[in-house]
C-alpha cells in the first residue's frame, strides 16, 4: 500500500513537471513570436517612413526644377522683349556709302558689257548691210535662175548679201552694169531664194564653176541676220547672269562689312 502511494506520488510529480515544461516552452515560443512581430512592425514602419521621405524629397526636387525652368523662360521672354524694343541695329553710313558705290560699279559694268556684246553682234551686220537700202528688204525679186543667167554669168555682180530671215539675196551690181544690152536702172537686184544660206552659197559657186571661175575668185557672199530672236534671247540671258552675279557678290560684301563692323564694336 505504501509503495503504491509512492508510485502515484512520483507519477503525479512527473506529470506536473512535464506540463510545467510544456507551459514554459509555449510561453517562450509566444514571447519569440511577439518579438518577431514587433521587429517586423518596426521594419515596415521604417520602410514606410523611408518611402515617404523619398517621395517628399522627389516632389521637392521637381518643384525646384519647375521653378528654375520658369525662371529661365521668364529670362528669355525678357531678353526677347528687350531685343524687340531695341529694334534692328542701324547700319553705319560708311557701309551704306560703300554699298551704293558697289551697286553703281556693277550697273556700269553690266552696261559696258551689254554694249560690247551688242557692238559685236551688229558689227558684221553693219559691214554686210553697206550699200543696201530699206527698199531692198521689201521689194519683190527675180527667180534664182534668171539671176544666174542674166547677172552672175555676165560678170555684172560685185557682191551678194544673203538675208535668211527674208528668204532673199540682194545682189549689188558694178557701176555701169549692162543688163540685156541696157544700162541697169538700179544699183542692186533682189533674188528670191527660200532655202538656207549654205544651199545658196553652193548654187552660186556651182554656176561660177560652169563658166570657169574658181572658188577663191568667186563673188563675195555676205550673211545679214540683224537682230534675231536668238540674239535677243542670248543678250537677255547674258544681262540676267551678270545682274545675278552682281547681286550675290553684293550680299557677300554686305555680310562681310557688317561682320567687320560688329567686330570693331566689340573691341
UniProtKB/Swiss-Prot annotation:
How is this protein situated with respect to the membrane? Answer: Multi-pass membrane protein
Q: What is the lineage of its organism?
A: Eukaryota, Metazoa, Ecdysozoa, Nematoda, Chromadorea
Gene3D superfamilies registered for this protein in UniProt: 3.40.1690.20
Q: Which organism is the protein's source? A: Caenorhabditis elegans
Q: What is its main location?
A: membrane
- The protein's name is Uncharacterized protein B0495.9
Q: Where is this region: Disordered?
A: 58-90
Entry's transmembrane regions: 101-121, 226-246
Localisation? Membrane
Amino acid at each position: 500500500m505504501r509503495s503504491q502511494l509512492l508510485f502515484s506520488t512520483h507519477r503525479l510529480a512527473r506529470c506536473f513537471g512535464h506540463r510545467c515544461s510544456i507551459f514554459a516552452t509555449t510561453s517562450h515560443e509566444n514571447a519569440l513570436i511577439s518579438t518577431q512581430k514587433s521587429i517586423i512592425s518596426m521594419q515596415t514602419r521604417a520602410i514606410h517612413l523611408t518611402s515617404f521621405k523619398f517621395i517628399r524629397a522627389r516632389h521637392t526636387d521637381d518643384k525646384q526644377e519647375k521653378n528654375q525652368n520658369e525662371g529661365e523662360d521668364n529670362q528669355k521672354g525678357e531678353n526677347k522683349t528687350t531685343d524687340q524694343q531695341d529694334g534692328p541695329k542701324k547700319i553705319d553710313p560708311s557701309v551704306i556709302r560703300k554699298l551704293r558705290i558697289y551697286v553703281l560699279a556693277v550697273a556700269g559694268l553690266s552696261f559696258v558689257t551689254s554694249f560690247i556684246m551688242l557692238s559685236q553682234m551688229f558689227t558684221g551686220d553693219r559691214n554686210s548691210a553697206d550699200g543696201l537700202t530699206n527698199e531692198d528688204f521689201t521689194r519683190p525679186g527675180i527667180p534664182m535662175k534668171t539671176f544666174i543667167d542674166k547677172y552672175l554669168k555676165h560678170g555684172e555682180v560685185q557682191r551678194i548679201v544673203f538675208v535668211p530671215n527674208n528668204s532673199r539675196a540682194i545682189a549689188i551690181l558694178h557701176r555701169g552694169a549692162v543688163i540685156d544690152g541696157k544700162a541697169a536702172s538700179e544699183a542692186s537686184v533682189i533674188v528670191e531664194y527660200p532655202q538656207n544660206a549654205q544651199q545658196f552659197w553652193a548654187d552660186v559657186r556651182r554656176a561660177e564653176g560652169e563658166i570657169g571661175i574658181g572658188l577663191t575668185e568667186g563673188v563675195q557672199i555676205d550673211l545679214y541676220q540683224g537682230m534675231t530672236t536668238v540674239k535677243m534671247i542670248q543678250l537677255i540671258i547674258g544681262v540676267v547672269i551678270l545682274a545675278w552675279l552682281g547681286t550675290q557678290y553684293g550680299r557677300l560684301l554686305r555680310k562681310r562689312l557688317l561682320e567687320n563692323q560688329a567686330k570693331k564694336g566689340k573691341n
